[in-house]
Amino acid sequence: MSQVIKKKRNTFMIGTEYILNSTQLEEAIKSFVHDFCAEKHEIHDQPVVVEAKEHQEDKIKQIKIPEKGRPVNEVVSEMMNEVYRYRGDANHPRFFSFVPGPASSVSWLGDIMTSAYNIHAGGSKLAPMVNCIEQEVLKWLAKQVGFTENPGGVFVSGGSMANITALTAARDNKLTDINLHLGTAYISDQTHSSVAKGLRIIGITDSRIRRIPTNSHFQMDTTKLEEAIETDKKSGYIPFVVIGTAGTTNTGSIDPLTEISALCKKHDMWFHIDGAYGASVLLSPKYKSLLTGTGLADSISWDAHKWLFQTYGCAMVLVKDIRNLFHSFHVNPEYLKDLENDIDNVNTWDIGMELTRPARGLKLWLTLQVLGSDLIGSAIEHGFQLAVWAEEALNPKKDWEIVSPAQMAMINFRYAPKDLTKEEQDILNEKISHRILESGYAAIFTTVLNGKTVLRICAIHPEATQEDMQHTIDLLDQYGREIYTEMKKA
């Protein structure tokens, strides 16, 4: 029977020009890698953002799905020139917007290898060594957090999925089907939007999400937090979770984790930390003390595709007690009975939402093995220094206001000539952002702090230099003065 099947396969492939045999596949991969590496080698000289014009999008729309295939090299070349070229390059050293994704080439290699083997990493028996590696990495990361008793976790696509996974465990640990409608959750006015979205998905409506004000350092005000908790308890609600942040998206601020933990313990609440950005600082010998208190949480989210230099998407959710994830996500349908494991050798489909999932943790393990944690820690510390260099470049400049000083590789500032109104200053800073984006030299967007439109830099690329920071600030100053003059003439 097997010979018949083999014969049919060979018959199908004979004369079929567009089926890739091993030689064609090798040639296509070599060609792509050569072109990609040549592009990456000259990255400092390339624009950070290349915008696609309408006619270029129209050109792509004209490429219909063919009935007959095309040569692979033709399509790959088309993608390189017409698709990948037009993007905001989060791997560029001067991409300072959002939280950049400066992926290590080692992670990229790991991604290629894992994709080539197309591993199903949902169950330990399907890929036992993959499961072993992922669990060992998660245990090591949990140790850095301070989870030591019975920790565990799972690799997910990003912080949004990590947060909703942890929040599901929090709901199931502290609420029941009967009192779910009374549960209240507490975030700050600087908490990432994915947290509120996740709370809504698990059944906590906006009317039961409390947004706690922050102090002058953009940290959650724990006095206001306890007042809100006490008020809700008196009103018959059930406060069940507080979400603190280790590295807010706007300013890099770290909430008072130890104080929040004490309040959660006092009121029998789950304490989750959104560490998507800042948890990586735990690998920095110099700065890890900034995150004192992470080990007091019940769960934490952590994005490796941010400050651990991984390709998208690679993130983790870690819990102090893995049984909480198992309680929320374990199912045992008939088609998985042959693969069922116990809690000591858990299948990842029993501790997270995904059944079929890629082996996201292998590239992180490869990166840790090749680079070592010391080098990664140094790269993280370099990000802190980049923000300091930006602040030092700003200080002597006239009419610039630092709104949030350098911390956690971030800084917020604005051009604020005193003869302009606040509204005019807001417009001016928006125009400065647009102009530097148009220049292609750096990517810097605005955000809003204390009601002011500000320019925000998040600088975590290990290859960014002091010269990059100085020239970026010089350009912003130049554009600010030019636009100011244009506005006064208008």
UniProtKB/Swiss-Prot annotation:
Activity modulation comment: Inhibited by (S)-alpha-fluoromethyltryptophan.
Organism (species): Mediterraneibacter gnavus (strain ATCC 29149 / DSM 114966 / JCM 6515 / VPI C7-9)
UniProt keyword annotations, A-Z: Cytoplasm, Decarboxylase, Lyase, Pyridoxal phosphate
Subunit and partners: Homodimer.
GO biological process: L-tryptophan metabolic process
Residues the record lists as N6-(pyridoxal phosphate)lysine modifications: 306
Gene3D superfamilies recorded: 3.90.1150.170, Aspartate Aminotransferase, domain 1, Type I PLP-dependent aspartate aminotransferase-like (Major domain)
Catalytic reactions of this protein: L-tryptophan + H(+) = tryptamine + CO2
GO terms for cellular component: cytoplasm
Matches recorded under Pfam families: Pyridoxal_deC
Cofactor requirement: pyridoxal 5'-phosphate
GO molecular function terms noted in the UniProt entry: L-tryptophan decarboxylase activity; pyridoxal phosphate binding
Taxonomic lineage of the native organism: Bacteria, Bacillati, Bacillota, Clostridia, Lachnospirales
Function, in words: Catalyzes the decarboxylation of tryptophan to tryptamine. Tryptamine is a neurotransmitter that induces the release of serotonin, which is suggested to modulate gastrointestinal motility. Therefore, the tryptophan decarboxylase from the gut bacteria Ruminococcus gnavus (strain ATCC 29149 / VPI C7-9) may influence host brain and behavior. Has weak activity with tyrosine and phenylalanine.
EC number(s) recorded for this UniProt protein: 4.1.1.105
Intracellular or extracellular location(s): Cytoplasm
Name of the featured protein: Tryptophan decarboxylase
Class of enzymatic activity (EC top level): lyase
Protein family (similarity comment): Belongs to the group II decarboxylase family.
